[in-house]
Amino acid sequence: MSKRAFPSFHEQKVGIIQSIIYREPFWLLVAVMLLNQTPGKSARPIFWKLKERYPDPDSLAAADQGDVETMIHTLGLQTQRSRRMIKLAQSWAAMPPQKGVLHRTKNYPQRRDGLNIGERIEGDAVDCTGALEIGHLPGCGPYAWDSWRIFCRDILRGVADDYNGLNAKQGFEPEWKRVLPQDKELRACLGWMWLREGWLWNPGTGKRRRAS
């Protein structure tokens, strides 16, 4: 269980950085790249400085790797992370995610998912087993894919105006309700979101029961 202190049930946002920047999906992916294997209290200040220095994908795509390394060196793995962030920005600038275009994500969300489909799939679909709109972007893995699905996918697909079904059609189920993340903070986040709806949720199985 995450040690993060989650907000009360009266709050509308969970407090993790993904819930703050979900309307800027490129930066959500950069943030999770920095957060991977790094405490949020260390990564967050550097993330905001990086975003201020390089305000859009094009500027980060053209950044000098050495400059990026210098900005993030206190987090460790600065060479690998800076290279990945720049490649991510270049790929995003060249081919940003599009509604109705999914790219293969091998072994996601479960082992062997995506092994028997093509690299690119045309057509919008609720089911994203083995393929996602961001599956072509380098440097992304299950943590980034889970974060994208929870906070960004419904908006890109045009089925809701936020990650919790704002202005969606009656009977709509938000994407986050179908995600089973491995990351402890994402699990705690979803546990909190389910509990706000009156459910105790098992992060390993996805099963739930009414909270007493």
Language-model regions: role of each:
Residues 1-117, 197-212:
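N-terminal polyanion-binding entry modules of DNA glycosylases/AP lyases
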Residues 1-23, 101-138, 142-212:
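C-terminal accessory module of base-excision DNA glycosylases/AP lyases that mediates lesion recognition
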